[in-house]
Curated annotation (Swiss-Prot):
<feature type="domain" description="sHSP">
    <location>
        <begin position="26"/>
        <end position="137"/>
    </location>
</feature>
<dbReference type="GO" id="GO:0050821">
    <property type="term" value="P:protein stabilization"/>
</dbReference>
<keyword id="KW-0143">Chaperone</keyword>
<dbReference type="InterPro" id="IPR037913">
    <property type="entry name" value="ACD_IbpA/B"/>
</dbReference>
<comment type="similarity">
    <text>Belongs to the small heat shock protein (HSP20) family.</text>
</comment>
<keyword id="KW-0346">Stress response</keyword>
<comment type="function">
    <text>Associates with aggregated proteins, together with IbpA, to stabilize and protect them from irreversible denaturation and extensive proteolysis during heat shock and oxidative stress. Aggregated proteins bound to the IbpAB complex are more efficiently refolded and reactivated by the ATP-dependent chaperone systems ClpB and DnaK/DnaJ/GrpE. Its activity is ATP-independent.</text>
</comment>
<comment type="subunit">
    <text>Homodimer. Forms homomultimers of about 100-150 subunits at optimal growth temperatures. Conformation changes to oligomers at high temperatures or high ionic concentrations. The decrease in size of the multimers is accompanied by an increase in chaperone activity.</text>
</comment>
<keyword id="KW-0963">Cytoplasm</keyword>
<dbReference type="InterPro" id="IPR002068">
    <property type="entry name" value="A-crystallin/Hsp20_dom"/>
</dbReference>
<dbReference type="InterPro" id="IPR008978">
    <property type="entry name" value="HSP20-like_chaperone"/>
</dbReference>
<dbReference type="InterPro" id="IPR022848">
    <property type="entry name" value="HSP20_IbpB"/>
</dbReference>
<dbReference type="Pfam" id="PF00011">
    <property type="entry name" value="HSP20"/>
</dbReference>
<protein>
    <recommendedName>
        <fullName>Small heat shock protein IbpB</fullName>
    </recommendedName>
</protein>
<dbReference type="GO" id="GO:0005737">
    <property type="term" value="C:cytoplasm"/>
</dbReference>
Length: 142
């Protein structure tokens, strides 16, 4: 029997908390760039990408249907550098996140090498639970 680890796929599904947390494991692989997804409450999320060496002009964020795509293309140095040790990676990347229904990007900021993308879940009124008042008058057919 083969075991398939779906956690690398599920960690990029934002707003599908029950599904993602049920299948996600602690030993998930990390891709470039490193990122966090935090949940403030049931309706507010934040994706934070660590982008040392990138400038704001090097970054592009697009929402394509339910896919949030973040791309980065760093500026190439004018002069070739000879590295004795290179621990900081500055390479082109493209990351995509699948958003749940009714998730919207509410804003993005780039400060101190960290790109923050804020997401909000906006439930339409017809989907949100409605409280039905109970009256004291008799029913129609009684």
């Amino acid at each position: 029997m083969r075991n398939y680890d779906l956690s690398p796929l599920l960690r990029q599904w934002i707003g599908f908390d029950k599904l993602a947390s049920a299948l996600q494991t602690a030993g998930e692989s990390q891709s470039f760039p490193p990122y966090n997804i935090e949940k403030s409450d049931d309706n507010h999320y934040r994706i934070t990408l660590a982008l040392a060496g990138f400038r704001q002009e090097d970054l592009d964020i697009q929402l394509e249907g339910i896919r949030l795509v973040v791309k980065g293309t760093p500026q190439q140095p004018e002069k070739e550098t000879t590295w004795l040790h290179q621990g900081l990676v500055s390479q082109a990347f493209s990351l995509s996140f699948t958003l749940a229904d009714n998730m919207e990007v509410s804003g993005a900021t780039f400060t101190n090498g960290l790109l923050h993308i804020d997401l909000t879940r906006n439930e339409p009124e017809q989907i949100a639970p409605q409280r039905i008042a109970i009256s004291e008058r008799p029913a129609l057919n009684s």
